[in-house]
């Protein structure tokens, strides 16, 4: 019996599910960015993974939550005199961010259990999904550790390093989802030459590094200084005594606004140069499909650079900063899909190449 049609439908369902989860992760990053930019991230002072899904429902509940917030350094230093109505707005952003995280968990694990039972998950895919599930759980813990850092005495915001780690982990989950989804395609796709495959893989790695550096810029508010381009304080390269003004020197990479912003700028140039060289190489030596995808990466990188420059020159308005963060996810998605497809696909259907996990795997693959 020819099972190719059934295999295509099964693979398509899994691929669609993975892309839906990836889209939810992008939404999560967007809501998280809005939560940070509106100063809402410290409005919920407790981590209750289950009961926290229920927001305050009565005036007494709201008064209790507001009383907890009034004990935080952020309130006492920045927001003294804030009324309950303003607090509800802050609380709504943070609660929505956490609720979306719970929704992502359900949308990820419930279909995963169903697909596993139906035998639609191959062993290789299953291991990848298991790793992403564990990383998602770790991400929740990282989020609370980040929030807790902002509740310490004298703090009015979360620690920049923890914010960057939280953003990068979300980005890594997104990259993993689209990598696995792209790998679920059926048919035949010739692999690109080895050099192109290597540089295609380098691109999402560089983008992840750049996202981490962007998290440091956001967390330290380094985008609010040196609001000129291409120079910083009138120079293309600030003097070393400005870049390494803090002792010990290693702390400059997190706490020195000049070095934090300079690192983000230089890495952006590096990503652009690598993307352009890769696209030229793909045009000259690679298959047409790889050349088209590589050109798409360049276009997105160029758009992201332009938006980043505009965000800097405008002194980080909320809309520009949020768009810059979301477009970074688009760049990462395109670069990751391109890297995965550059590896090509063989003639053998994955479902036939290895036994599936789940009920059908135990039954020998008979349906």
From Swiss-Prot:
Can you tell me which family this protein belongs to?
A: Belongs to the COX15/CtaA family. Type 2 subfamily.
**Which pathway does the database say it acts in?**
Porphyrin-containing compound metabolism; heme A biosynthesis; heme A from heme O: step 1/1
Transmembrane portions of the chain: 12-32, 99-119, 127-147, 163-183, 198-218, 266-286, 296-316, 317-337
- Metal-binding found in the keyword field: yes
Q: What does this protein do?
A: Catalyzes the conversion of heme O to heme A by two successive hydroxylations of the methyl group at C8. The first hydroxylation forms heme I, the second hydroxylation results in an unstable dihydroxymethyl group, which spontaneously dehydrates, resulting in the formyl group of heme A.
The record's listing under HAMAP family reads:
HemeA_synth_type2
Name of protein? Heme A synthase
GO BP, sorted A to Z: heme A biosynthetic process
Q: Which PANTHER family match?
A: CYTOCHROME C OXIDASE ASSEMBLY PROTEIN COX15, CYTOCHROME C OXIDASE ASSEMBLY PROTEIN COX15 HOMOLOG
Q: Which residues form the signal peptide?
A: none
Instruction: Write down the InterPro entries for this protein, in alphabetical order.
Output: COX15/CtaA_fam, HemeA_Synthase_type2
* Species this chain originates from: Methylobacterium radiotolerans (strain ATCC 27329 / DSM 1819 / JCM 2831 / NBRC 15690 / NCIMB 10815 / 0-1)
- Cofactor requirement: heme b
Q: Name one Pfam family in it.
A: COX15-CtaA
Subunit structure, interactors included: Interacts with CtaB.
The enzyme's E.C. designation: 1.17.99.9
* Class in the EC hierarchy, top level: oxidoreductase
Q: Which reactions fall under this protein's catalytic activity?
A: Fe(II)-heme o + 2 A + H2O = Fe(II)-heme a + 2 AH2
| Sequence positions that bind heme | 264, 324
Q: What do the Gene Ontology cellular component annotations say?
A: plasma membrane
What is a GO molecular function of this protein?
A: oxidoreductase activity, acting on NAD(P)H, heme protein as acceptor
Where found, per UniProt?
Cell membrane
Keywords (alphabetical) are: Cell membrane, Heme biosynthesis, Iron, Membrane, Metal-binding, Oxidoreductase, Transmembrane, Transmembrane helix
State which gene encodes it. Answer: ctaA
């Amino acid at each position: 019996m020819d099972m190719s049609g059934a295999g295509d439908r099964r693979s398509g369902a899994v691929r669609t599910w993975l892309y839906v989860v990836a889209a939810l992760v992008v939404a999560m990053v967007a809501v998280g960015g809005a939560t940070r930019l509106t100063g809402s991230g410290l409005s919920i002072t407790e981590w209750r993974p289950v009961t926290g899904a229920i927001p305050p429902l009565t005036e007494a509940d709201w008064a209790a939550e507001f009383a907890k917030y009034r004990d935080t350094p952020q309130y006492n230093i920045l927001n003294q005199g804030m009324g309950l109505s303003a607090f509800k707005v802050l609380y709504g952003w943070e609660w929505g961010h956490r609720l979306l995280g719970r929704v992502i968990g359900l949308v990820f694990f419930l279909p995963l259990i169903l697909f596993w039972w139906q035998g639609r998950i191959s062993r290789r895919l299953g291991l990848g999904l298991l790793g992403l599930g564990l990383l998602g759980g770790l991400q929740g813990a990282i989020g609370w550790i980040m929030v807790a850092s902002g509740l310490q005495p004298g703090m009015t915001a979360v620690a920049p390093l923890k914010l960057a780690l939280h953003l990068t982990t979300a980005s890594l989950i997104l990259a993993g989802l689209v990598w696995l989804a792209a790998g679920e395609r059926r048919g035949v796709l010739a692999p690109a030459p080895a050099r192109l495959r290597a540089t295609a893989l380098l691109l999402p790695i560089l983008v992840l590094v750049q996202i981490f550096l962007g998290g440091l810029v956001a967390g330290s508010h380094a985008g609010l200084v040196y609001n000129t381009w291409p120079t910083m304080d009138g120079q293309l390269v600030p003097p070393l005594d400005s870049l390494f003004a803090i002792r010990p020197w290693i702390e400059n990479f997190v706490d020195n606004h000049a070095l934090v912003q300079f690192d983000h700028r230089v890495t952006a140039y590096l990503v652009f140069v690598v993307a352009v060289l890769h696209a030229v190489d793909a045009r000259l030596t690679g298959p047409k499909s790889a050349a088209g995808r590589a050109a798409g990466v360049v276009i997105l990188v160029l758009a992201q650079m332009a938006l980043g420059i505009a965000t800097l020159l405008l002194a980080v308005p909320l809309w520009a900063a949020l768009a810059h963060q979301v477009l970074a996810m688009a760049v990462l998605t395109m670069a990751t899909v391109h890297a995965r497809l550059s590896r090509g696909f063989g003639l053998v259907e994955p479902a036939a190449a290895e036994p599936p996990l789940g009920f059908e795997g135990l039954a020998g693959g008979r349906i």
